[in-house]
């Protein structure tokens, strides 16, 4: 059963609490609650829920509000639930009808929410926020123009689209070959201990874990490590890991043989089967075992070929989907996380593509321009992007749609130099591309885009998309404030004009020189 309390049933005056003072309507969470299109957002989220099976869901407004609170305040899952249970304004914002001390839900529910909400759902939420922000602007400044018949002529291009790519860094230990092999060796030793207990054998395989640990500590304490020392240490760790993997294979064969003879119970649960299919470890350990084998083969290949490159390189045992993304930045040449292609229009940002592998962002240009047309009903007038986007094929595609670009032309430079006006105009338009860079900086510095803490690939993508959704809400707040200031100014201006007209009419009535007799009128 899907639970949702409509927005028109929740008012600030009806919110009950044991405190003597009324809640302030000027609170930032009260103002934000009045701006958000709750019903439309809830309709998108409800499509991912089942109406026929499963237990009762948490109120959808609570789910949406908790996601906003989490990323707007930069809290973890437990901290978000604790903050909602302690703050009366946050409880009103999340849709509760009265103040309560108990936690609204368990923090682990956030994981299920992130699994359920993907990039498509968050993109639909962003479209709703963009439409809300566009409705607050004056009619001349609005960009969305979808309400037109198909028989009419195509709408003229309008607006400016800024596109760029960045990497959302994953929260993992900085990977080095030595540390990665050391962690893989420790995990292999742990798996050996688990399997050995199930064999019932008296002799445990020799793994040299104490010697390997001692060598790792001595190596890690060295401030400066030469290439010869690093290669020698990696070679030793590879041999330790190879021995452990061989022991694991033998233990697995031994366990399988014993189970077929019915000399051992199947799995830890005590299920006896003649031909059991269960792997003798948990799914997590089984996955780690597979990852360790891939790491060994990759590191062995690089060790034998004396290189530092390999396809689909694994940099973390527990998050094997993370790949090194070369960026060529001065601060950090290589980043570890998901590469995203994003666009920005009038302060509103969207994510069109998320990938855990390196890709050329120029392939996303057509996707991002078409997404702009789907949202606003027309193509942009101007496209601002890096030079990597402006290849020959993309330039031709943009020219066919009358989309202007700002960038260095291909081929030989023009013989006719630009005049002062053209130079100023080009520089001004190029500076507008800084807006999308500013969005990336805002996300990384204020909302944790450079520290994605989810442990799965799908939940990490949801985490990234939710950050952009919250940044759009922050922009919506600013647009609403400007709209309120403009409305107040116009209201005051109209009242002043009315008073001036009334004063002028009164002056005309009281002036004897301006009065006319009936004979003069005739």
Explain the meaning of each model-derived region.
Residues 321, 329-375:
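Electropositive, glycine- and tryptophan-enriched low-complexity nucleic-acid-binding patches
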Residues 53-58, 88, 384-392, 411-412:
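Acidic, metal-coordinating catalytic cores used for nucleic-acid/nucleotide bond scission
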Residues 27, 64-66, 80-84, 106-110, ...:
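Short, conserved catalytic/metal-binding motifs centered on acidic residues
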Residues 37, 54-61, 72, 102-105, ...:
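Secondary-structure capping and boundary motifs in well-ordered enzyme cores
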Residues 1-36, 481-522:
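Charged, often Cys/His-bearing segments associated with DNA-binding zinc-finger transcription factors
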Residues 387-457:
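Helix-centered, glycine/charged polyanion-binding patches within enzymatic domains
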Residues 23-68, 72:
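Basic, short loop/linker segments at the boundary and entry of helix-turn-helix/winged-helix-like folds
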Residues 97-319:
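Active-site- or DNA-interface-adjacent structural scaffold in DNA-acting proteins
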């Amino acid at each position: 059963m899907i639970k949702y309390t409509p927005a028109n049933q929740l008012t600030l005056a009806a919110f009950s609490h044991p405190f003597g003072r009324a809640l302030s309507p000027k609170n930032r969470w009260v103002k934000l609650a009045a701006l958000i299109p709750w019903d439309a957002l809830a309709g998108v989220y409800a499509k991912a829920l089942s109406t026929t099976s499963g237990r009762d869901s948490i109120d959808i407004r609570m789910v949406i509000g908790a996601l906003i609170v989490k990323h707007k305040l930069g809290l973890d899952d437990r901290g978000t639930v604790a903050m909602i249970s302690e703050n009366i304004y946050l409880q009103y914002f999340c849709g509760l009808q009265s103040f309560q001390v108990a936690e609204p839900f368990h923090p682990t529910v956030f994981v299920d929410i992130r699994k359920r909400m993907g990039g498509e759902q968050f993109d639909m939420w962003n479209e709703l926020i963009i439409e809300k922000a566009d409705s607050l602007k004056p009619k001349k400044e609005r960009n969305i123009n979808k309400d037109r018949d198909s028989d009419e002529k195509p709408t003229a291009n309008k607006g400016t689209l800024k596109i760029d790519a960045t990497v959302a860094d994953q929260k993992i230990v900085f990977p080095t070959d030595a540390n990665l092999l050391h962690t893989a060796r420790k995990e292999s030793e742990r798996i050996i201990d688990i399997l050995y207990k199930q064999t019932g054998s008296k002799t445990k395989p020799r793994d040299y874990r104490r010697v390997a640990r001692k060598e790792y500590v001595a190596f890690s304490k060295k401030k400066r490590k030469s290439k010869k020392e690093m290669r020698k240490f990696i070679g030793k760790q590879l041999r330790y890991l190879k021995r452990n993997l061989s022991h694991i294979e033998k233990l697995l064969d031994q366990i399988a043989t014993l189970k077929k003879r019915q000399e051992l119970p199947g799995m830890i649960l005590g299920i006896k089967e003649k031909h059991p299919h269960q792997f003798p470890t948990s799914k997590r350990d089984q996955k780690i075992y597979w990852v360790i084998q891939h790491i060994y083969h990759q590191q062995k290949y690089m060790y034998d070929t004396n290189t530092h490159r390999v396809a689909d390189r694994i940099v973390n045992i527990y998050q094997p989907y993370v790949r090194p993304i070369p960026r060529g930045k001065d601060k950090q040449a290589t980043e570890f996380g998901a590469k995203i292609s994003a666009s920005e229009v009038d302060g509103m940002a969207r994510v069109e593509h998320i990938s855990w592998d390196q890709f050329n962002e120029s392939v996303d240009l057509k996707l991002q321009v078409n997404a702009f047309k789907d949202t606003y009903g027309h193509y942009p007038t101007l496209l601002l992007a890096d030079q990597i986007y402006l290849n020959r094929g993309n330039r031709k595609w943009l020219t066919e749609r009358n989309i202007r670009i700002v960038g260095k032309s291909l081929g030989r430079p023009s013989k006719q130099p630009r005049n002062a006006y053209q130079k100023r105009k080009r520089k001004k338009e190029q500076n507008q591309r800084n807006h999308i860079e500013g969005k990336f900086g805002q996300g990384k510095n204020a909302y944790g885009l450079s520290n994605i803490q989810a442990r799965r690939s799908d939940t990490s993508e949801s985490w990234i998309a939710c950050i952009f959704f919250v940044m759009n809400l922050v922009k919506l707040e600013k647009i609403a404030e400007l709209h309120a200031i403009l409305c107040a100014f116009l209201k005051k201006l109209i009242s002043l004009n009315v008073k001036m007209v009334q004063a002028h009419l009164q002056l005309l009535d009281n002036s004897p020189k301006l009065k006319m007799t009936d004979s003069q009128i005739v």
